[in-house]
């Protein structure tokens, strides 16, 4: 009852303070939630947030900012609320305690009513609206400085709140009590209404946010992998000498060799067990019946099978994608294009490749990204070292399209400037692509902004530019394909062969239907016309955008770092503004020739129509100068990698730390 009386003495100032405290508490809770969500490693959340920021930047460029209004009004309201008349009526009382985090919905709703009643009503309005209250006797306890009531009617609009006012003496307290109790007759309390005793409100405590660990990949795909990763090692036997491919523009010979290799078949009692050190991951029905290779469309009734299969096989993971996944045969089908299974890949033109997981021996991990890992493996039947790219399917239809595009590009393009493709297979929710192993890795491994390594020298830079341009030119002229994601991490090099090749065609597109999707590729290397476009879906993505990305990549390899100012790295909008509004970066004149500077300047023209074509770039004097020269690329890559590994051993680190811009995106 004392709490009910105390609620009547609440002033508007106290209500505002309570609201401010609640707002601060809410903001703290919100920040806690944001911090928790920021630790998620889910690629879709990170990508969605980045796209939202880019979209906000585009809208800011189209709209004029108006002067902020309302600040004067807020100052006037603040001044009026703190006028001398109001200050005299304020009773210095502590804020009411906040509700318990685990309290019921009723208590939360009643607490919100107290805040609303305290903040929006003056003392007079509160007294006039409380017609159900019946205060018959008031006792002032000076020792405890609490105002108590012996008899008080229950007010259903205001919950019980423990408020301890500051009372200096008996006279002042009695005077205040009289002011709060005008001489008027209160209505009788209804006899039929019974109200339960409300519990005491405990101090507010922020709800604990429980970070539920995401289910592991092996658990989601039904695999029981060892802690160290996928084990593909065989028992000790006669050592075989691994072979490396000689530089060759075609992989036809090796594909035929792989097609003739035998597949070890047989039922296994435990699909997730390790047999002879080889991870057994055979899919359901793959060894009990013939593989569905008639066409590339799923059989009739796959939709029903997927809905009724539950969690068996791949049904639980791909229940909504029956048009791609054939549950009965355990295959991944792209209508009219290709079909993937645990035994290999079949293309619609009749060509096929037979590589299985049992034939691969894991050697090392080359890299990892948001959708999977890249591993160095040995194909035991042919004794060929390969690189397997694992792409996990996360119920994202866009990922299916990326897999289809990359497999099509790799299959169609036999070029000395594009990585060779050996085959692919599909097992338990992941696609494994077997490609040529490039022992030098991506080009970002052979340059650094530190003085110990530095950027790539001009002769080798011209060799790299020539190889990349020829690869992009073949994609465009022979296959009508644009890459859309040209950057140093998607360009591979081989120290053994001294070659440079393009890879990663997941976001590539056909020029016939080249309407670009929003923010395809890495935003750090995106052309300015794509960033500032308000409707990128309607803007046709041309090869000119790839030429901008090529120029920016060459400049980064020359400098050893991302070419835009480091002060823009931490702010996405600053980096976008530098790309769109700022002048394009240039090669330093003291280290590079005028021909090299002119080549980069042509690629980084802000107006797309002013950028040269691939044919014009191949005949540029800078590339012609070094075309017939031996730049000793193999020795150069080897020396750079050895220098890098030596630095890492001395520092005891796994990789060189780099100042990465905010727009950089990881992935495979």
From Swiss-Prot:
Residues 16-43, 68-91, 104-120, 270-300 have a biased composition (Polar residues). It is found in: Cytoplasm. Gene3D superfamilies: Phosphorylase Kinase, domain 1, Transferase(Phosphotransferase) domain 1. Keywords: Antibiotic resistance, ATP-binding, Cytoplasm, Kinase, Nucleotide-binding, Phosphoprotein, Serine/threonine-protein kinase, Transferase, Tyrosine-protein kinase. PROSITE patterns: PROTEIN_KINASE_DOM (PS50011), PROTEIN_KINASE_ST (PS00108). It is an enzyme of class 2 (transferase). Residues 1-43, 61-120, 181-313 are annotated as: Disordered. InterPro entries: Kinase-like_dom_sf, Prot_kinase_dom, Ser/Thr_kinase_AS. The modification Phosphothreonine is found at residue 518. Changing residue 514 to A: Loss of phosphorylation. Residues 239-250, 301-310 have a biased composition (Low complexity). GO terms for biological process: actin filament organization; cellular hyperosmotic response; hyperosmotic response; MAPK cascade; osmosensory signaling pathway; osmosensory signaling pathway via Sho1 osmosensor; p38MAPK cascade; protein import into nucleus. GO terms for molecular function: ATP binding; MAP kinase kinase activity; MAP-kinase scaffold activity; protein kinase activity; protein serine kinase activity; protein serine/threonine kinase activity; protein tyrosine kinase activity; protein-N-terminal amino-acid acetyltransferase activity. It catalyses: L-seryl-[protein] + ATP = O-phospho-L-seryl-[protein] + ADP + H(+); L-threonyl-[protein] + ATP = O-phospho-L-threonyl-[protein] + ADP + H(+); L-tyrosyl-[protein] + ATP = O-phospho-L-tyrosyl-[protein] + ADP + H(+). Alternative way of activation involves binding the proline-rich motif to the SH3 domain of SHO1. Kinase involved in a signal transduction pathway that is activated by changes in the osmolarity of the extracellular environment. Activates the MAP kinase HOG1 by concomitant phosphorylation at 'Thr-174' and 'Tyr-176'. This is MAP kinase kinase PBS2. The gene is PBS2.
């Amino acid at each position: 009852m004392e709490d009910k009386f105390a609620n009547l003495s609440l002033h508007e100032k106290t209500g505002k303070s309570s609201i401010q405290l609640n707002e601060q508490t809410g903001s703290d809770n919100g920040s806690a939630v944001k911090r928790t969500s920021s630790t998620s490693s889910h690629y879709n959340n990170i990508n969605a947030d980045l796209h939202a920021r880019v979209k906000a930047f585009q809208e800011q460029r189209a709209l004029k900012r108006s002067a902020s209004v309302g600040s004067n009004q807020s100052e006037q309201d603040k001044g009026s609320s703190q006028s001398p008349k109001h200050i005299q009526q304020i009773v210095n009382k502590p804020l009411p305690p906040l509700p318990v985090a685990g309290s019921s919905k009723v208590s939360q709703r009643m607490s919100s009513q107290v805040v609303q009643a305290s903040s929006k009503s003056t003392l007079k309005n509160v007294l006039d609206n409380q017609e159900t209250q019946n205060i018959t006797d008031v006792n002032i306890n000076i020792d405890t400085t609490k105002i108590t009531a012996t008899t008080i009617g229950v007010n259903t609009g205001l919950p019980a709140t423990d408020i301890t006012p500051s009372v200096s003496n008996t006279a002042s307290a009695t005077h205040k009590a009289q002011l709060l109790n005008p001489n008027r007759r209160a209505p009788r309390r209804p006899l039929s209404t019974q109200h339960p005793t409300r519990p005491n409100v405990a101090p507010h405590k922020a709800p604990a946010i429980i970070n539920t660990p995401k289910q592991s990949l092996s658990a989601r795909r039904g695999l029981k992998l060892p802690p160290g990763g996928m084990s593909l090692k065989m028992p000790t036997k006669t050592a075989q000498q691994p072979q490396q491919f000689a530089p060759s523009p075609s992989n036809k010979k090796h594909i035929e060799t792989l097609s003739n290799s035998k597949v070890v078949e047989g039922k296994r009692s435990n699909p997730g067990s390790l047999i002879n050190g080889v991870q057994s991951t055979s899919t359901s029905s793959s060894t009990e019946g013939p593989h569905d290779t008639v066409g590339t469309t799923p059989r009739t009734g796959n939709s029903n099978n997927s809905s009724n299969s539950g969690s068996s096989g791949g049904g639980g993971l791909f229940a909504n994608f029956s048009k791609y996944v054939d549950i009965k045969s355990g295959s991944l089908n792209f209508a009219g294009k290709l079909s993937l299974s645990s035994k290999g890949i079949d293309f619609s033109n009749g060509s096929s490749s037979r590589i299985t997981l049992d034939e691969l021996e894991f050697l090392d991990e080359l890299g990892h990204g948001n959708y999977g890992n890249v591993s160095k493996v040995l194909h035991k039947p042919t004794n060929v070292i390969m690189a397997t790219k694992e792409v996990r399917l996360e119920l994202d239809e866009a990922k299916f399209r990326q897999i289809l595009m990359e497999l099509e590009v790799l299959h169609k393009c036999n070029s000395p400037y594009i990585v060779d493709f050996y085959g692919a297979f599909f097992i338990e929710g992941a696609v494994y692509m077997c490609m040529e192993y490039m022992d030098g890795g991506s080009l970002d491994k052979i340059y650094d902004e530190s003085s110990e390594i530095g950027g790539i020298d001009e002769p080798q830079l011209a060799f790299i530019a020539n190889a990349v341009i020829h690869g992009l030119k073949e994609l465009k002229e022979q296959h009508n394909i644009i890459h859309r994601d040209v950057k140093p991490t998607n360009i591979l090099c081989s120290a053994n062969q001294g070659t440079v090749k393009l890879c990663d065609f997941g976001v590539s597109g056909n020029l016939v239907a080249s309407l670009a999707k929003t923010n395809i590729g890495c935003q750090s290397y995106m052309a300015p016309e794509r960033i500032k476009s308000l409707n990128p879906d309607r803007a046709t993505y041309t090869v000119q955008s790839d030429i901008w990305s090529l120029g920016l990549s060459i400049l980064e390899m020359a400098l050893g770092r991302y070419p835009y100012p480091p002060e823009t790295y931490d702010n996405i909008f600053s980096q976008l503004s530098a790309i769109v509004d700022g002048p394009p970066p240039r090669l330093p004149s003291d280290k590079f020739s005028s021909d090299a500077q002119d080549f980069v300047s042509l690629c980084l023209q802000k107006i797309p129509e002013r950028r040269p074509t691939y044919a014009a770039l191949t005949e540029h004097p800078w590339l012609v100068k070094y075309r017939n020269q031996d730049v000793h690329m193999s020795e150069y890559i080897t020396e750079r990698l050895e220098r890098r590994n030596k630095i890492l051993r001395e520092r005891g680190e796994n990789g060189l730390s780099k100042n990465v811009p905010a727009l950089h995106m990881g992935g495979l």
